[in-house]
């Protein structure tokens, strides 16, 4: 599970980074990239410049930084990936509150949630990989020696 979770998390983080940075660039260059300006009516924004910069720099940046740290096996990679996953979910919550529902939001919220679940898997917080009883203290490594 650990090797699979690590590789899957790296792939998801790179995907999230590229997607958010690409969306940020498109939104900055094309003022929302085709998203109607009327979605911003109830916000303090008059254009998509600031939201696009936040998407590209903050969301894309944390996703990319977490992917790089995890790829390099840095000690802070789990924390960075957790921040990136929750950041993605918070971004989607804010989007839902401001502009309403779109199918892509389900995908990206799921991406953030899956990132957090994979971090929990890497940390062993989802339970032991091998079923044990209170009297059994043999770990997986000891059993395979």
Give short role names for the model-derived ranges:
Residues 1-145:
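Topology signature of small-to-medium multi-pass alpha-helical membrane proteins
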């Amino acid at each position: 599970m650990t090797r699979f979770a690590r590789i899957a998390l790296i792939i998801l983080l790179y995907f999230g980074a590229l997607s958010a940075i690409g969306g940020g660039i498109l939104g900055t260059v094309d003022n929302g990239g085709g998203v109607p300006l009327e979605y911003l009516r109830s916000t303090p924004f008059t254009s998509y410049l600031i939201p696009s910069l936040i998407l590209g720099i903050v969301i894309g940046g944390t996703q990319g930084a977490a992917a790089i740290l995890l790829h390099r096996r840095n000690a802070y990679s789990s924390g960075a990936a957790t921040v990136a996953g929750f950041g993605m979910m918070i971004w989607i919550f804010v989007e839902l509150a401001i502009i309403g529902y779109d199918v892509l939001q389900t995908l990206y919220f799921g991406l953030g949630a899956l990132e957090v679940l994979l971090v929990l898997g890497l940390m062993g917080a989802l339970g032991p990989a091998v079923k044990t009883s209170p009297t059994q203290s043999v770990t997986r490594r000891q059993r395979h020696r």
